[in-house]
């Protein structure tokens, strides 16, 4: 049994899916099924094992050197990016709040105490233009889904969070390599574990 709290925005549409995954995780299920995004062809169902999910979440936790954390999930929870945020919250035993995915995820949250967020490059660019003060409140921002621009474009606006470019796919249960753009790392580094 994991000790964490899940919260939902009023317009979040996948609460039943989240509750089913939480139930299955707490029952000890060993296999979970999600669909690929379809960016390289027709979406297909992928089986992710509990062992792989634990490795992915634990490797990310170790890479980010996390202590106290609270996740803001604004990605589709039935796809890898959002699904893994749920799995991380279960394994890390931290609070998570789910929001309806949009290109402007920070548009309606106001003041917040979230520490970690995963964004697509489109969401990140929009948030950087419109809500840099809210982005600055995060400790870690993970950007996945496509290549991102170099760090010079945001280093002048963001001085607090560590910004990570990630590389992964559904079949690997999220990212397998990360690059710290805040520290000007020049390459993606594989997660250890």
Question: For the regions a protein language model found, what residue spans apply to each?
Answer:
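Gly/Ser/Thr-rich phosphate-binding loop
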Residues: 129-184
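Conserved adenylation A10 loop of the ANL superfamily
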Residues: 30-46, 168-171
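Short Gly/Pro-enriched turn/cap motifs at secondary-structure boundaries
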Residues: 186-193
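Conserved pre-ATP/AMP-binding loop-to-beta segment of ANL
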Residues: 17-35, 69
